[in-house]
Amino acid sequence: MRGRLCVGRAAAVAAAVAAAAVAVPLAGGQEGSQGGVRRGSRGTTMVKKRKGRVVIDSDTEDSGSDENLDQELLSLAKRKRSDSEEKEPPVSQPAASSDSETSDSDDEWTFGSNKNKKKGKTRKVEKKGAMKKQANKAASSGSSDRDSSAESSAPEEGEVSDSESSSSSSSSDSDSSSEDEEFHDGYGEDLMGDEEDRARLEQMTEKEREQELFNRIEKREVLKRRFEIKKKLKTAKKKEKKEKKKKQEEEQEKKKLTQIQESQVTSHNKERRSKRDEKLDKKSQAMEELKAEREKRKNRTAELLAKKQPLKTSEVYSDDEEEEDDDKSSEKSDRSSRTSSSDEEEEKEEIPPKSQPVSLPEELNRVRLSRHKLERWCHMPFFAKTVTGCFVRIGIGNHNSKPVYRVAEITGVVETAKVYQLGGTRTNKGLQLRHGNDQRVFRLEFVSNQEFTESEFMKWKEAMFSAGMQLPTLDEINKKELSIKEALNYKFNDQDIEEIVKEKERFRKAPPNYAMKKTQLLKEKAMAEDLGDQDKAKQIQDQLNELEERAEALDRQRTKNISAISYINQRNREWNIVESEKALVAESHNMRNQQMDPFTRRQCKPTIVSNSRDPAVQAAILAQLNAKYGSGVLPDAPKEMSKGQGKDKDLNSKTASDLSEDLFKVHDFDVKIDLQVPSSESKALAITSKAPPAKDGAPRRSLNLEDYKKRRGLI
């Protein structure tokens, strides 16, 4: 009994395969009666062979092999259908009917008539379902072909037309011609024009000619400058146009890419939707079939109970097989539902998720500002705009002799009442910071240069969650990071520089040049007095007084060390003078108590004694001579040297008479060896001889001015 049922099912599947095979046209065949007979005979032979195989297998295989056989037959039918859809020939219904008739006739030859009737009904139902599926697939493929043809026929945006290309070529030609232009003012290199101009210049005088040429040179220089300026402007305009064209082309390319991506995404979504709809349709059909089969079973069981007749083995086995089919269909529906749910999950994953909030301290460090950056930017024009929205690590005090820091967001920039020192500059700006619900103004000097730590980041997150506030997203972090990079590469103009200079001068303690500032204030004061503005003059006078006080304070601070050094030097000088006086007194005291030493060398000067004898000394010598020889012959010897030879003769005669008595006295006479020297020389010699003698034993040492004055009694 079970073998017959398997044979019946195999026959039904074989009929479906034959119907699908008939739909495929024969290449190069002619339509006619002979062709129809051939196709019919071919279909019958194929079915007979397959049925023969099934009958043989059904007798030998077990119940487990029946399911494998059904699966193989279904896969074969699907292959045939796919081949027929790829070729897409016009399907002829009469041929299909003839094929089905031949297959029915074949079934009549092989099996009983009653069974064949039932199986024919099932074959018709299966044929209708297959035709519906083929029609749906053809419609879907037609719609997809229409979409693809529409997409291919639609012109893409951003394409450059022939007119645009021609205009661009003409513009490039004009650019090249403008670049080839040269300066020409109507004169040659020698500043002369045509023959008439040369003749006119020759008729002029040399002075007029030189003046005319000089004027032409000046005019040429002016025209050259104008020409160069115009040329530069033209080149700048060309560059701008080229840049604009490049930007437009880039934008068009971007638009094309976005359109292509959007079209791909839309086509992909359409395909996924169509597949999902098909799967949903299959699932709904399977569920409806299951419900219908269950209702049939309920009706059958109710009828059987009502009749109270014994069940047939065929009905029992058929119910089991139907239950197995139901289980298979339920498994298929579960698979289809799983695939549909997986497709939906994939679509959800493909949708770009919303920007995630910050979850790591490294992500927040990208928009952290250090004290060094704030010091550089505090006077810049973009400071308030760039800083707002960034984060800082602010110090809030000490705990157990350790500094405590918090992560805070900058919500604004304000000016405080106190001017303080920030690195190398001075400012009065403060930051309005927010940590959770708490807001407070801090000076820039309390900002840290270090990065956020893990504990500080977690405390900030807890404060934000407790306050019910949202964390910054990664998109916001990226935007703020771009603004910080723009601030680092900011290009200053003249107005920005003037504002920065004014901002720095506001908080400067003292001007860089006191003299220039003082002269400027004096001029302003004189102008105010001339105009009669006494209030302004008074204000300027107050500024002058403050400036003088600052200058004096700086001078005192500058000369503080210098005055201390000069005081030390003066004190040392006075001490040296006192010590030198003490040394001189001690030295003189030692010289007095010192005994004469014959072996010591003494400083002495020779004295010239020629013609320098004093009259008193000469008289003493003569007296000694007279006393020695016992005669007073020379009483008048100490007379003037100017009397000369007369006196010498008298003296010689007198001595000769006295000495003649003794022979020894004849040889006893004085030979005068003194020479007569002019009076000026004698005076000079006398002056030199009157030099004060040096003190015996006193050391020679240099005297300073104060010692000299003390010795002279001037002090």
UniProtKB/Swiss-Prot annotation:
Pfam families named in the record: Plus-3
Coiled coil ranges: 531-565
Residue span, Plus3 domain: 358-489
Composition-biased stretches (Basic and acidic residues): 197-218, 246-256, 274-296, 637-652, 697-709
Compositional bias of kind Basic residues: 115-135, 233-245
Keywords attached to this entry: Activator, Coiled coil, DNA-binding, Nucleus, Phosphoprotein, Transcription, Transcription regulation, Wnt signaling pathway
GO biological process, one term: blastocyst growth
Compositionally biased spans, kind Acidic residues: 58-70, 317-328
Modified residues (Phosphoserine): 58, 631, 660, 702
Modified residues (Phosphothreonine): 60
Region Disordered: start-end pairs: 28-218, 233-362, 632-654, 679-715
Bias kind Gly residues: ranges: 29-38
Compartment annotation: Nucleus, Nucleoplasm
Domain note: The Plus3 domain mediates single-stranded DNA-binding.
Function, in words: Component of the PAF1 complex (PAF1C) which has multiple functions during transcription by RNA polymerase II and is implicated in regulation of development and maintenance of embryonic stem cell pluripotency. PAF1C associates with RNA polymerase II through interaction with POLR2A CTD non-phosphorylated and 'Ser-2'- and 'Ser-5'-phosphorylated forms and is involved in transcriptional elongation, acting both independently and synergistically with TCEA1 and in cooperation with the DSIF complex and HTATSF1. PAF1C is required for transcription of Hox and Wnt target genes.
Protein name as it appears in the record: RNA polymerase-associated protein RTF1 homolog
Species this protein is from: Mus musculus (Mouse)
Taxonomic lineage of the native organism: Eukaryota, Metazoa, Chordata, Craniata, Vertebrata
